Amino acid sequence: MTLFILTETSAGYALLKAKDKKLLKRDDLATEASTAEGVSNLLKLKSFQKFDSAATALEEVASLVEGKVTPRLASLLDEVKDEKKVSLAVADPKLGNAIGKLPGLSIELVADSSTTDVFRAIREHLPTLIPGLLPQDMSTMSLGLSHSLARHKLKFSPDKIDTMIVQAIGLLDDLDKELNNYAMRVKEWYGWHFPELAKILNDNIAYARLVLKMGMRTNWESSDLAEILPEEIEGAVKAAADRSMGTEISQEDLEHIQALAEQVVGFAEYRQQLAGYLTARMNAIAPNLTALVGDLVGARLIAHAGSLTNLSKSPASTLQILGAEKALFRALKTKHDTPKYGLIYHASLIGQATGKNKGKMARVLAAKASLGLRVDALAEWDDDATEEDKAALGTEARYNLERKLAAMEGKPLKPRGVAIAPNGAPQAQKFEINEARKYNADADAVTGDEPASAKKSKSKKLVEEVQDEEMADAADSDEESDSSDEETDKKSKKSKDSELEKLAEKAGLSLKRYKRKLERGEIQFDAEGNPSAVSKKDIKKAKKEAKKSAKGEEKKRKRTDDGEVDNSEKKKKKKKKGEE
C-alpha cells in the first residue's frame, strides 16, 4: 500500500510520498531520518501548493486549527484519488476525520503515534525536501504567520469585551481606597492649622475644595465659599475660622497641602467619569444582569468569575454564594450552616428585605440573574434591537421580584397589568377605544304581558314532555315523602344540637369541646343528669382502682371456692368412718 504524508507549512501544503511502503513500521526510522540525506532517501515530494499571500496563509491555518478542509487542500488531495490502495499520514487526528468524510476519496488515514518520528524529521529538514525553499525565508514566514494567528485569536475572542469591565471595576475599587487615604491625609495635615473644620464638614471632596479655595484660615473674609458650601455651613465655617485654635503654618506647607487636595479633587472627578463609563458598558454587555442587581454588583460578579461566559455557565446556587468562598469552605469544614449570599448581598433588592426574607430574596434573585446572564451571553440580537428590548427580561423579572418582596414584607403590592419603563418603574399602558356595542331593539319586551308561571320560573324549557296522571301522582308522592323525610331529619338534628348546647353550657364547655370529650368518655353525669368534665388523670385513677377492686374480688372468690372444697372432703371422710 502506497504511503503519502500531508505536511502543513507556513509556505503551503506539501504532499510527500514514501519510497518504502512499510516506512512507519521500521525500527530504525529515527536513526535514518536524523540527517538530511537520510530524509531525502526515505521521502520524495509529490506536489506542493504554495500560499499566495500572508492573508491566505492565515485563513488556511485558521481553518486547519478548527479541523476544516479548505478548497485548496481538497484540490491537493484530488491528485491521490486515481491511485489504488493508498494510505495518508496526517499529524492532526481532527483534520484526519474531516478528510475521511470527503466524498469520492477512499484513503486509509493514519493519525497515531507512529507518525511522530516522520513529522519530526520533516520539520527539521523541510528545505531539503522542497526545492527553492530557503531556511531564512521559512523562519520569517513562520514568525509572521504565528503573529497573525495570535492576533486573529485575540480579535475573535468571545471574552475580549469582558476585560474592560474587569479592569474598570478593579480601578474603581483602587480609586476608592486611594481617595480615602488621600482625603484622610489632607484632613490630618490641614487639621493642625484649622482643626474645627473637620467637625463641621464631613464631605471629603468638599473639604479638599475648601482647602484649595480658602488656603489660610485668615482668608475667610475675602474667600467666597458659596459655590462649594450652602449658606448655613458657610457661616459656621467662617465663624469657626475667626476663633480657631489651630497653629500657624508657612506658605510652603500650604502649597504641599493644596497639591494633595488637588489630587483628591482630580481623583474624585475621574471616579465619576469611570463610574459613568462602567454603567454604560454594563448596560451594553449585560443589560439583564444590570437591571436585576445593578451595575456595580454585576461588574463585581463578572470580575470574580473571570468573564461573562464563565459567569453564565455557573448555576444559580453558585451565583448566590459567589464571593463567599472562605465562609463556605469554613462552614463545610466545621459542619456549620453554609452562607446564604456572597457578592449578591449588596444588590438593592436584598437590601430592601428584612431579616429572614434576605435569604429567600437572595435565592430567587440568583435564579433570575442566572437566566438573564444566559440571555446576555448567548442571545443574538438584530441590528434594529434597542436597549429596552435587550433588557426586557431583566426589567420584567425585577418588577415581579419587587411584588414578591412586597408580599413577603406585608407591604402594598404594585399594580398588575401595567407597562414597565426601562428603569423598572411601572407606567400607564396605551389607551385604546373599542367600538361601542349596538343596542338590540328586538330584545325588548313588556313585563306585564308575561303569564304567572313564566314569572315564577323563567328557566323552564319551552317544550316539555307530559307524563301520565298516575305516574305524575306517584312521582309527586315520592317527592313529597322525600322532602318530608329531609325535613324531619333536619328537625331532629336541630333538636339534638340544641340539647347538646344546653348540656355544654351546664358543663362550662363549648359545643365542639363537649362533643370531643363526650366521644372520648371524659363527660360524667350525676344522679340529676347534669354533665361534668373529667380530666384524663382522674379517668386513669378510676381505671386503676377498678382493676384493683376486680383483682380483690377474684381472690375472695378463689378463697371461698377452696373452703367449700375442703368442707365437702371432710364430710365425705366422716361418712366413710361411720360406715366402717
UniProtKB/Swiss-Prot annotation:
* PROSITE patterns recorded: NOP
Q: Does the keyword rRNA processing apply?
A: yes
Write out the annotated subcellular location.
Nucleus, Nucleolus
Matching SUPFAM superfamilies, A to Z? Answer: Nop domain (SSF89124)
Q: Which spans does this entry mark as compositional bias, Basic and acidic residues?
A: 495-505, 547-562
Pfam families the record matches: Nop, NOP5NT
What PANTHER family does its record include?
NUCLEOLAR PROTEIN 5 NUCLEOLAR PROTEIN NOP5 NOP58, NUCLEOLAR PROTEIN 58
One GO CC term of this entry?
Answer: small-subunit processome
Q: Which stretches are tagged as biased composition: Acidic residues?
A: 465-487
Domain Nop: residue ranges:
285-410
Q: Which GO terms describe its molecular function?
A: snoRNA binding; snRNA binding
Q: Which organism is it from?
A: Aspergillus niger (strain ATCC MYA-4892 / CBS 513.88 / FGSC A1513)
Query: What biological function has been recorded for the protein in this entry?
Result: Required for pre-18S rRNA processing. May bind microtubules.
Q: Which gene encodes it?
A: nop58
Which keywords does this chain's UniProt record carry?
Nucleus, Ribonucleoprotein, Ribosome biogenesis, rRNA processing
Cell wall biogenesis/degradation found in the keyword field: no
Q: Where is this region: Disordered?
A: 444-580
Query: Which InterPro entries does its entry note?
Result: Nop56/Nop58, NOP58/56_N, Nop_C, Nop_dom, Nop_dom_sf, NOSIC
Family designation = Belongs to the NOP5/NOP56 family.
Q: Which GO terms describe its biological process?
A: box C/D sno(s)RNA 3'-end processing; endonucleolytic cleavage in 5'-ETS of tricistronic rRNA transcript (SSU-rRNA, 5.8S rRNA, LSU-rRNA); endonucleolytic cleavage in ITS1 to separate SSU-rRNA from 5.8S rRNA and LSU-rRNA from tricistronic rRNA transcript (SSU-rRNA, 5.8S rRNA, LSU-rRNA); endonucleolytic cleavage to generate mature 5'-end of SSU-rRNA from (SSU-rRNA, 5.8S rRNA, LSU-rRNA); protein localization to nucleolus; snoRNA guided rRNA 2'-O-methylation
What's the protein here called? Nucleolar protein 58
UniProt lists compositionally biased (Basic residues) regions at 570-580
